[in-house]
Amino acid sequence: KLDSVRALQMAPFDSLLRTRKISQQMFELIAADRECNVRSVMAQVGVLLRSEEIQTAAFEGFNPDSDRMLGALGYFDLMEAYASRKLMERREEIMPMVRAGQINTLLIGEYKKVLTGERLESAYAYQWCFAAIQRQYEKELIPLYEEFKHTYPNSPYLAAMQGYYEEICAFHAPKNLSDDIQFMTDTEDIST
């Protein structure tokens, strides 16, 4: 099924390549982008339909640590779907971390198992930034940022991450309460 969808999507670009209206390099970039898109959609459909068969087909022959895929627009969505699938295979084992709000830690841990070099750095930064942008201020993002900064001290992504990191740290910093604040005691009998 994946091959037939890919062939259908690439047919217009095949003719453009044959007539030299696009370069081989552009054709390869488009092919990687379409493959990422198709696999990502298949994976999402498989999750929604709870179809093991569709999810398996979505990742059949998929190499997550491919330079070819890194340039595709849907690469990070596909990587998150791939990592989530791997985590679901261990759902009982990971539930304590899920309950503790460690979902990004789990996803990044999966990335570390299958990605290397620039692909790992990019996926790690993307996952972290995507979580930080949500402004849920997950405390797990603090040590993840510190680990990223230690591992990739010259990463261009650090500039984008630092502002969010500072916001998250400020949110979790102990707050000094004013002495003028008074707390009610014996509130059990108060009717709302």
Feature annotation, model-predicted:
Residues 1-191:
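Oxidative protein folding and maturation machinery
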